[in-house]
Amino acid sequence: MAVEIDDHQDIFAAASVAQIHEALGQLHEQEASVTQRLNALIASQKDLSRELGRLDLLRAHLGTQAVNTRAISSGMLSDAASTANRISSAVKRLDQEQSNVKATLEVVEQVAELKACVLGVHGSMGAPQDWETAAGYLSRAAKIPDDVVNGSFAEEIVPTAEVPDPPRVTLDAAAESLCGLFLREFEKAAQEGDGSKVTRFFKLFPLIGRTNVGLDAYGRYVCQGVASRARTNFNSAAPAQRNEGFFYGNTITKLFEHIAQIVDGHEPLVERHYGPGMMQKVIERLQIEADVQGGIVLDTWHEERHIDRKLTDIKSYAFSFLVQSFLPSQKPAAGTPRSSSPANGAGRASEDEGVDMKEIDGLLGEGALILGRYALYARFLSDKCAPSEPEDRIDYGLVMPNFLATSNLHKKVNSHLIEPVNAMTTFFFRRSVEKAFQLDEPPADLTLNPTKPLGSNPPFITSAVDDVMYIVNQVIQRTLATSQRSVVSSVVPAVSHILGAEFIGMIQRKMRDESYPKPVIQGGLPPEDKVIAFLVLINNLDIANDYVKRIVQQQLGRQSQGGEDDVKSPLHDLFPFGHDAVFVENTLKAMEKAFASKSGDLLNDGITVLFSNVLKPRIRPILAEAFRDVKYDPEDGENEDKEEEDVDVVKSRFDRGWGVVIRPIKRILTSANFDRLLALGLNSLASSLEKRIKSYYGRVNELGAVRLERDISGIITAATSGGAYSLRDVFQKSTQMTLILNMEDDEFAEVAEDTSGDSGIPWVLDVEERKRVRAIVKG
């Protein structure tokens, strides 16, 4: 329709006869097409009607077949289904009857077994008094289900004229009677010390279902042995023995060893007769006795050693020497009196008498011994009580059982040992640092005169460094030997703080107030004694840093040469619980890092002061003397003989002057410190050489450039003699400057604009600098 409308519109819109004919032609074509399609549809209608008729016939035929099929199903298959249903029901009834028969037979057999056990128990407990057999019958009866034992059938069948009571009553009465009998016999054997009888009756308790009674009796038995031996060890000692340094440590060690021997020796027996994991109940009972006996030892140690009084004395100690040393008004003379001098002895006598360091050291040794033994004991019990298979695969380390973590002994270890040991160790170390500086002595007979021998052996440090680092090593070793994380977490940070604040602080104060190398007169050099003292203090820092690093690495116990990151640290043996070993390792590394940082900062400052006040003022005069009366613009043939004689005059002058300054310092400084100082000195020397070369602008000809290059090279060789070849790197600018001075014009033209290194020379001079250097040579 839309086409017709459009066509009519075209016709109506026609403006000429030709357009009308064209529109009519299109309409005729459309008419022919529509007529053809209609004829095709009319022709296909007959075939469609015929196919629909065939479908109606097929539908009627299928309806007939469906009726026949339903008739066959209801007539034939229903009989088969009914038969199958009857057979299935019969099979099910047969299976049920069979299972009932089996259940009945099983009950009959169990009742027969029950009757045999009841009669066996009654017979064995009679005249024969065969307790093992009676217990065996009770054990067999315990395997019979309770519903059978308590059932009416058993109550009807089992009783006899000799045993008229129901089986449950008979069994319970027999078990109770045997339990009382076994308990009496067990305790009697324990009192008599008859080990075989103790074992005999101990094995019978689980057979009669009295496991807890047996374990409790056994626990009391072994605890009596523990208590008896502990009292003997403690009370048999004479008063003089109790005053010995490690009496209490040895006593509690014997207690722990005895308990460990009992657990190790008796565990197989308990596990075999009572089942896996049952030894833990005996261990818990032993721990109660350990709380008592160990508590007595710790209480007596705390009282006899006057721990509370010692802690009071420690808290009241003023550390007068350290405090006064850091006061701003403190201006000690260069020769500080020794502590043994009459000038200082009177002021400290009362303090030294108030706290006996030897006694504190002894208490710390004994305390560390007890803590270490307790750690081994705790680890042993934790291993014994640990589950055979962890709940998950994540390794949380060893876990302390709850009965031990909440025990009175554990609480007393914390209050009577760990807290006092932490306080006394911190005091002991700080007082040792104070004492070391009170007794500090510099190395004897040091001199800057290279012709005189040194009166000491290197490294040249004061006595305080060796003294303090010896105490650091001792304190760290003793702290780790306790195997207590709480001791490490308190002591190691305290040691780190004292080292950083007071050990380094004392050296810093001496460097600033007593030994600062300041010239006496303007433009002069510092006094020799000040320079020597300053050098020694710088050595103190370097050697102390090396000591601390070695102490920590020794405790970590790892070999850095193997390159294996998964090497297990020995700290895992000392600290097996949780992640304590990782915590301890990180704490030690933090101490090492903190000390290295503080000592390194002060060391670098000291090297800078030494360079600025001692070495730097000498560099310019040394160079001036080396280049004195040397000309680099000689005429051809002028003074050739003289120049050949003085070919190395600059190098020899410099070597002489440089050696006068450097060699005395090198004799005293450690090699690491000397390398640090030399690096600063060479940087300054390189800068001075660059300025010296530039100062010859317009005063260097081609012959002079050759000699200047030789002289600069000679100075570099003399300055870096005996050091690493890499020290020459700071002179790259000077070397390249002399290289440019001696280039031919065409050679220089090739490298003048080189910025990419195509010339084969890694230039440190930029393009403009190269041009300015080239201009130094007279054209």
Q: Which residues are covered by each model-predicted region?
A:
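Extended intrinsically disordered, low-complexity coil regions enriched in Ser, Thr, Gly, Ala
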Residues: T133-G136, A154, P387-E389, R393, ...
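Eukaryote-biased recognition of C-terminal alpha-helical segments
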Residues: V399-M424, F428, S432, P570, ...
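Terminal end segments
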Residues: G657-V660, P664, I712, I716, ...
